[in-house]
């Protein structure tokens, strides 16, 4: 029950107030008659109130069991879910004694009795060191202290005191000071059955004690009590008898769980000098002591958390202080987990025998007691639920291993510890580098739960490899549930002990915030989660004489010891076997509580051992998809998960027996009810205990018919006890693999040799471990009729005995024992405490019975025999007496005895054959299993690597969680201080007296009543008017929607009509395409004719070429026309290009004409549909255009002919011109040669002439000189010409000769003159010759000049003729150009016609496309409008529903106001004066009501606007509909195409406008609907706020009434 819930708090406080007021009146009336003090009267009053309050709390707990599961998350934020460690409250009374021998005193609101059995909180045996409050005076003193510490006002005060008491527990542990726990009133504090971990009641057996004779799981000796069997309720969890030995007391005088000697040593004390439970070697540290000051069992490294070590100094499994002491080690001299002291106290026994295994103070909560003292680790309900596996201080550590002192897995005399690997073997929790938790061995040797080298914790399963109880993603320890932080039991933020979950809050298995225990069972008497072994030895303690769960033999390997690299007991290999899945409850060796397998599945059959909340996962449920500890395959059930209601492995139920409930001895370990379900029996008897997935073998599942894991026998051997020297639980032979020994193919945990023998099969013929009764279902009852774990076959057959060939579980190598062999050997093997006293086992049916002769004769005489039976008796007697058998035959015997024997032999042979076939089938299945195991082994290697990585990541997460825990611890301390201050103020108010408060409450109630009356009346009137208006508006809107739906239907009809028109247009287009093809065929014919004409033109062109050859003869004209022809050729080329372009244009014109014809035809076809008269005119025009086109085509053909002729002429002319060119070139070359020759001659002549002239000048000069020399008297000018000079010389010489010479000339001069004359004459002759030559050359030049001139004249004549021809050709070209221009003009006219028609056609196409597009758009818009209308309709419907809801909510508000009124009136009867803060509530309510009225009025106005706009939208829709109808009516009347197009445009524009208007109207409607919806939501919020305020006001009034005591 959550005391912070406002409703429950109000109800409880108000009820308490009424009860206390009545009690107070009664006390006041009787106060004067008795001479008692006021303090005593007040104490008695508070006692009575506490009892009444507690009874109410019990009722509410029973009614709200489901609510507890749902409120787990809320409890994390509240102090009762996680108790912080803070300073002690000054009011808490603590009794301090010696740290070792003094037990704590539980201060409770009820009196503390001296008798141990009647203590309300915790059973504390009488101790010589401590005097309990036995005398009446002492009782009164105690009661006074109680009155001061815990005034029973309400559950708030109790919760705060529990916080203080819990802080005292946490602070006192390091100094070995017992804690004082003050449980809340509602936590069954007064019930005598709420003793510690296993204390049930006077006769309530311990954790595993089930029914009257229901032995505990491991109850071994005659009167040996259960693990937690207290006696009448007195002894500790492990206290067995009067001073019965510890938790593990097994045989008659069996010592404690680990107590091995006469009674001396501690839990781990094995022999005389056996070391402590955790004592490893000579100086071996304690169970959890790792290094010099190493922490306890789970203490990993420097700051490594203990098995349950949670935060900075988080406590060990039992570690309470800052991390100092050993598992149970509390103070400096605190005893070890297996305290060695004088008489070997209990395993965790701290005082002389006082506290329970986890008992911390007298009434201190269990190790895992986390909350206000509410749920134990396995707190079942209220009546007598034991703690989960109350681990605490005395609880042996989950994985207590000790080296020599046999650990949890004590093997034999000196065998290795469960985790003992060598002398210095690491502790069970020794991690090696701080690695694995509880069961880590060395060298990768798997711990109890060790999976691989970096193997995860005890329950670490597969990829998600979380710890045994690892729940979340962040690898918690064995029971680690919470954020991923804590060790084996670390559950919440405050990482307490092994089971310590929250900051000091939940139990070992307490998973959620403070919710149910790990194995929270139910209520009536469900046993603890961790009820494990026979005497619930430490988590795995099994053997007969107190050996551990996996006690192997003298020196067998550890339970999980496989080999050096053997996989851990729980090594699953991705879904493989369970962690410690053993026999008897197949719980893992270390399967403890927190995450323990289904073993502790308590609830009504519901959750698994660790299954916490509604869907909480099992103990082994690991993380994201990790299945439960036993959950192996895809949907495989948990280890003990039975089915829907099937009992779990340890499913207790109301009176269900414990995990190992045998029955009177026979039932299996998990036999729960009538002896029916197997340990692992899941649903209809289907899956084994550990049945994992589809093909996953169970822990003990061997083959299909292999017996179950825990088959015990007649209840004799321990869970793992094999014989004296018998190998341990899974030990089969000397080399037989351990419990989890897989061999090479990783066989199942119990599968040993070929997978057949059971896990626990003991010795040669010893009955199975869990051998139950004659028909008791096996522990792991499979299917297919295969014998179950406990299947007996006449209660005798071996566990695994399938046939003569199937090796039994204990069958060692190839020994194949017959079915009867174990039956004979069984009694000899079971003598050492095999049967429990008063528990007869099932009879050995085949064993010899020794009866007296008289009784035999009497029985035989009284029996009636058949003939066959009588014959058999005769045979037996004849064999005894030696009489021949034939003499005893009857004369009337029907058959021959030999024939009968033959028949029997045949029947036996048949049975043998069937058994052999079954054996062959089993062998084949074993081979398949071996293959599967090989594949699983490979998967396991990958899984281990992943798990190692996850461990590293999760260690980091643990560090982060520790930091968070420290912060949350500080916050909790602050909250506790604040709550203590509030408690003081409440106490002060209580002391002031109830009268003033009652008066105030009466005034307040009257004010509230008036305000509520006014508010309800106003709200009702306004809501009624608003609802009426809303209904009217909704009816209007509905009508409008109907009208709009009709309009949309009409629009759909119009759209269909438009679609029909579009179909007709498509047909017309197809017709036009056909006509277009016909016109193309006609054009092709025309082109063929043109090609023929071109051929003719080519022939004429050839003729012209012949004429051109004749013209080549005129070579003289070629020279003249040469230059002009080039220009003419250029022009001709340009003309040719123009002609080619004209040709192309003509072709285009033809194509366009054809297109025009086609378009005209299409236009005609279109016009014919609507215009009957215009069709005839258009046909005539078309015919005229066709005739015109034909004429144009004929003209074009003529032009083409002319152009072809011109081309031929031009080509002929070109040929002639080419010939003339060639001749001209030849003539030019000849002329050039002649000119060159003449020039050379002229050059040579000019040179000769120059030379001759030079010689003449020289000769003349010489003659002049000589003549002047002869005739010096002559004076002649030298500048004269030579001829003139000679003439003058002749004249002057003759004159001189005529004169008488004065001197006679000499002969020399005369000779010289003669020589000069001769030379002159010779020179003159040469000059004459030169002159003649010059004259000849000049003549020749003149002749050449004349010839050249003549040739030039010839060329000029030719050029003139060519020019004339060119002129003629130009004239013809001009004529052709004129013709072409005319054709162009005609073509342009046709082009204009064509363009006009194409323009018309394009416009028609555009209009058609636009019309079709607009039709489509219109259809889309109509569809959108329809959708908008539908949406508006749906929104209006929603508005209606919301209005209805609002009206309902208003009615609820009215009802609540009336209830408040009546409640306030009721409060006036016993009320007090009003409190000033409550007077403000009616004013607030009035103001809020006024606001709601204003909002309702605004909403009404908005709704009116909405209706108006909706009407406008409806009108626009009607207009659109009318216009569409008009368009439909006007459609067929229109005639002309152009008018139709314009009208279509207008219509489409109108339709667009109308659709846009409709869209706007729809948008407005949507906006208005949104606004109305927002207003409705606002009104809802206001109504909710009003309701909340009313509820708060009601709660406040009730709380004030309750506090005014």
Swiss-Prot record:
Widely expressed. Residues 196-808 are annotated as: 61 X 10 AA tandem repeats of [NSQ]-[NKQVGA]-[GSAQKRT]-[ASGDTK]-[KGTQSAV]-[KGAED]-[EQVGIPTDMA]-[EGVAS]-[AGVPETNS]-[AQNGPTVS]. GO terms for cellular component: endoplasmic reticulum membrane. The keyword Acetylation applies. Residues 224-258, 274-338, 354-378, 385-399, 435-479, 495-519, 526-540, 576-720, 736-769, 811-821 have a biased composition (Polar residues). Its main location: endoplasmic reticulum. The modification Phosphoserine is found at residues 111, 159, 165, 786, 818, 1162, 1178. It is a single-pass type III membrane protein. Residues 1-7 are lumenal. This is Ribosome-binding protein 1.
């Amino acid at each position: 029950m959550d005391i912070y819930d406002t409703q429950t708090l109000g109800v409880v406080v108000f009820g308490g107030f009424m009860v206390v007021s009545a009690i107070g009146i009664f006390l006041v009336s009787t106060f004067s008659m008795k001479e008692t003090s006021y303090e005593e009267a007040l104490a008695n009053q508070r006692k009575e109130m506490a009892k009444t309050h507690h009874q109410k709390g019990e009722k509410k707990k029973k009614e709200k069991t489901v609510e507890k599961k749902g409120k787990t998350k809320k409890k994390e934020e509240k102090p009762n879910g996680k108790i912080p460690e803070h300073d002690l409250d000054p009011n808490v009374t603590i009794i301090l004694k010696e740290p070792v021998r003094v037990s704590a005193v539980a201060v409770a609101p009820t009196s503390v009795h001296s008798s141990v059995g009647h203590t309300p909180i915790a059973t504390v045996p009488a101790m010589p060191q401590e005097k309990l409050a036995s005398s009446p005076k002492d009782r009164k003193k105690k009661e006074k202290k109680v009155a001061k510490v815990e005034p029973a006002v309400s559950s708030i005060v109790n919760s705060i005191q529990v916080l203080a008491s819990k802080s005292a527990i946490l602070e006192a542990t390091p100094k070995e000071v017992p804690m004082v726990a003050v449980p809340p009133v509602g936590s069954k504090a007064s019930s005598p059955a709420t003793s510690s971990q296993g204390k049930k009641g006077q006769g309530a057996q311990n954790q595993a004690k089930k029914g009257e004779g229901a032995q505990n799981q491991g109850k071994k000796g005659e009167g040996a009590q259960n693990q937690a069997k207290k006696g009448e309720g007195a002894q500790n969890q492990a206290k067995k008898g009067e001073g019965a030995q510890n938790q593990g007391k097994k045989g008659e005088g069996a010592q404690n769980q680990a107590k091995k000697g006469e009674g001396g040593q501690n839990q781990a004390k094995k022999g005389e000098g056996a070391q402590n439970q955790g004592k490893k070697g000579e100086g071996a540290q304690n169970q959890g002591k790792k290094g010099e000051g190493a922490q306890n069992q789970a203490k990993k490294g420097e700051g490594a958390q203990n098995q349950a070590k949670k935060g900075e100094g988080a406590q060990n499994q039992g570690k309470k202080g800052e991390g100092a002491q050993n598992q149970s080690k509390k103070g400096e001299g605190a005893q070890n987990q297996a305290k060695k002291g004088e008489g070997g106290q209990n395993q965790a026994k701290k005082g002389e025998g006082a506290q329970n295994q986890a008992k911390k103070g007298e009434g201190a909560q269990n190790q895992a007691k986390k909350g206000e003292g509410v749920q134990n680790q396995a707190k079942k309900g209220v009546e007598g639920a034991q703690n989960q596996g109350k681990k605490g201080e005395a609880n042996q550590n989950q994985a207590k291993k000790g080296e020599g002192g046999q650990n949890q897995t004590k093997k034999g005399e000196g065998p290795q510890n469960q985790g003992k690997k060598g002398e210095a073997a690491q502790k069970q929790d020794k991690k090696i580098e701080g690695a694995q938790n509880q069961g880590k061995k060395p060298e990768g040797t798997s711990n109890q739960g060790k999976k691989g080298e970096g193997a995860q914790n005890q329950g670490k399963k597969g990829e998600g490899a979380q710890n045994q109880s690892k729940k979340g993603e962040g690898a918690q320890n064995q029971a680690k549930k919470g954020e991923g932080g804590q060790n084996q039991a670390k559950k919440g933020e405050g990482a307490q002990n092994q089971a310590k979950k929250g900051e000091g809050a939940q139990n070992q298995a307490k998973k959620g915030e403070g919710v149910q225990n790990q194995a929270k069972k139910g209520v009536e008497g469900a046993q603890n989660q961790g009820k494990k072994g026979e005497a619930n030895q430490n988590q795995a303690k099994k053997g007969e004489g107190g050996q551990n769960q996996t006690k192997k033999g003298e020196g067998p390997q550890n339970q999980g010891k496989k080999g050096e690299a053997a996989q851990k007991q729980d090594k699953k290999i991705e879904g493989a076997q369970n962690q410690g899945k053993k026999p008897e409850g197949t719980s893992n060796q270390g399967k403890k509580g927190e995450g323990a397998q289904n073993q502790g599945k308590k609830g009504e059959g519901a959750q698994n051992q660790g299954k916490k909340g509604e869907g909480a996962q099992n103990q082994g449920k690991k993380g994201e998809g990790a299945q439960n500890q036993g959950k192996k395959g895809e949907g495989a059930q948990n280890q003990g998960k039975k089915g829907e209601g099937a009992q779990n492995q340890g499913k207790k139920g109301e009176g269900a027996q414990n995990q190992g409930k045998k029955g009177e001895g026979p039932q299996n370990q998990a036999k729960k009810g009538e002896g029916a379900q197997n340990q692992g029996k899941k649903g209809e008897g289907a899956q084994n205990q550990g049945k994992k997935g589809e093909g996953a073998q169970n822990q003990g599942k061997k083959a299909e018919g292999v017996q179950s894991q825990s088959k015990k026998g007649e209840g004799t051997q321990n869970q793992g006890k094999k014989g004296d020297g018998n190998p341990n639980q899974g030990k089969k032979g000397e080399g037989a693999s351990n419990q989890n020994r897989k061999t090479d193919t990783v066989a199942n945990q119990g599968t040993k040799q070929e997978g057949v023998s059971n896990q626990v099969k003991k010795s040669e013929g010893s009955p199975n471990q869990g051998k139950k009764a004659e028909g008791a279902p096996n522990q792991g009852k499979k299917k297919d009729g295969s014998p179950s774990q406990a299947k007996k076959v006449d209660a005798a057959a071996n566990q695994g005995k399938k046939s003569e060939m199937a090796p039994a579980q204990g069958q060692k190598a190839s020994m194949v024992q017959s079915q009867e062999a174990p039956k004979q050997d069984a009694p000899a093997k079971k003598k050492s405490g095999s049967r429990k006293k008063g528990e007869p086992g099932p009879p050995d049916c085949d064993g010899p019975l020794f009866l007296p002769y008289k009784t035999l004769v009497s029985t035989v005489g009284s029996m009636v025999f058949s003939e066959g039976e009588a014959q058999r008796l005769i045979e037996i007697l004849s064999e005894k007496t030696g009489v021949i058998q034939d003499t005893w035959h009857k004369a009337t015997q029907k058959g021959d005895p030999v024939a009968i024997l033959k028949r029997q032999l045949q029947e036996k042979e048949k049975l043998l054959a069937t058994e052999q076939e079954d054996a062959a089938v089993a062998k084949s299945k074993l081979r398949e299993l071996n293959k599967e195991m090989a594949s699983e082994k490979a998967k396991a290697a990958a899984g281990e690597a992943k798990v190692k990585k996850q461990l590293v990541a999760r260690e980091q997460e643990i560090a982060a969680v520790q930091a968070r825990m420290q912060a949350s611890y500080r916050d909790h301390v602050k909250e506790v201080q604040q709550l203590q201050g509030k408690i003081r103020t409440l106490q002060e108010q209580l002391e002031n007296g109830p009268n003033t408060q009652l008066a105030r409450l009466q005034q307040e109630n009257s004010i509230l009543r008036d305000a509520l009356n006014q508010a309800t009346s106003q709200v009702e009137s306004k809501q009624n008017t608003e609802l009426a208006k809303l209904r009217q508006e909704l009816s209007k809107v509905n009508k409008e929607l109907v009208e709009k739906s009709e309009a949309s239907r009409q629009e759909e009809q119009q759209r269909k009509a438009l679609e029909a028109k579009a179909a007709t247009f498509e047909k017309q287009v197809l017709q036009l395409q056909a006509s277009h093809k016909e016109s193309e065929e006609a054009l092709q014919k025309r082109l063929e004719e043109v090609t023929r004409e071109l051929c003719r033109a080519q022939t004429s062109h050839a003729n012209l070429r012949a004429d051109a050859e004749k013209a080549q003869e005129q070579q003289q004209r070629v020279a003249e026309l040469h230059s002009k022809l080039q220009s003419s050729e250029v022009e001709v080329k340009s003309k040719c290009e123009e002609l080619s372009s004209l040709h192309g244009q003509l072709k285009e014109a033809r194509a366009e004409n054809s297109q025009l014809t086609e378009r005209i035809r299409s236009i005609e076809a279109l016009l014919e549909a609507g215009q009957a008269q215009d069709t005839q005119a258009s046909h005539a025009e078309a015919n005229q255009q066709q005739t015109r086109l034909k004429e144009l085509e004929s003209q074009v053909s003529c032009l083409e002919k002319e152009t072809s002729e011109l081309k031929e002429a031009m080509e002929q002319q070109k040929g002639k011109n080419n010939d003339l060119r060639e001749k001209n070139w030849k003539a030019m070359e000849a002329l050039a040669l002649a000119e060159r020759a003449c020039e050379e001659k002229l050059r040579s002549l000019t040179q000769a002439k120059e030379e001759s002239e030079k010689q003449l000048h020289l000769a003349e000069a010489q003659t002049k000189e000589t003549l002047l020399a002869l005739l010096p008297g002559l004076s002649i000018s030298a500048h004269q010409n030579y001829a003139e000079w000679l003439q003058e010389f002749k004249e002057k010489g003759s004159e001189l000769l005529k004169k008488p010479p004065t001197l006679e000339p000499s002969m020399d001069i005369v000779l010289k003159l003669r020589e000069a004359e001769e030379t002159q004459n010779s020179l003159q002759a040469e000059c004459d010759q030169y002159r003649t030559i010059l004259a000849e050359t000049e003549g020749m030049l003149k002749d050449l000049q004349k010839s050249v001139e003549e040739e030039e004249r010839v060329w000029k004549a030719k050029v003139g003729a060519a020019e004339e021809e060119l002129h003629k050709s130009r004239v013809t070209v001009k004529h052709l150009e004129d013709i072409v221009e005319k054709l162009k003009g005609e073509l342009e006219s046709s082009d204009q016609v064509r363009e006009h028609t194409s323009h018309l056609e394009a416009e028609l196409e555009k209009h058609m496309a636009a019309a079709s597009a607009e039709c489509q758009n219109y259809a889309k818009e109509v569809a959108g409008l329809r959708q908008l209308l539908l949406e508006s309709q749906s929104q209006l419907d929603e508005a209606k529903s919301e209005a209805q809801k609002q009206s309902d909510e208003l009615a609820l508000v009215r009802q609540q106001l009336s209830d408040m009124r009546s409640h306030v009136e009721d409060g006036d009867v016993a009320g007090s004066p009003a409190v000033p803060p409550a007077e403000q509530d009616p004013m607030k309510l009035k103001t809020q009501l006024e606001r709601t009225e204003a909002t309702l009025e605004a909403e009404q106005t908005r709704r009116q606007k909405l209706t108006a706009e909706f009407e406008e939208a409806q009108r626009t829709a009607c207009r659109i509909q009318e216009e569409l109808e008009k368009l439909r009516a006007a459609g067929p009347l229109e005639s002309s195409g152009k008018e139709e197009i314009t009208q279509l445009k207008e219509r489409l524009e109108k339709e667009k406008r109308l659709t846009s208007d409709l869209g706007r109207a729809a948008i407005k409607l949507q906006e208005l609907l949104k606004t109305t919806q927002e207003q409705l939501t606002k009104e809802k919020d206001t109504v909710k706020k009003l309701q909340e305020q009313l509820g708060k006001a009601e709660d406040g009034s009730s709380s004030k009434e309750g506090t005014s005591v």
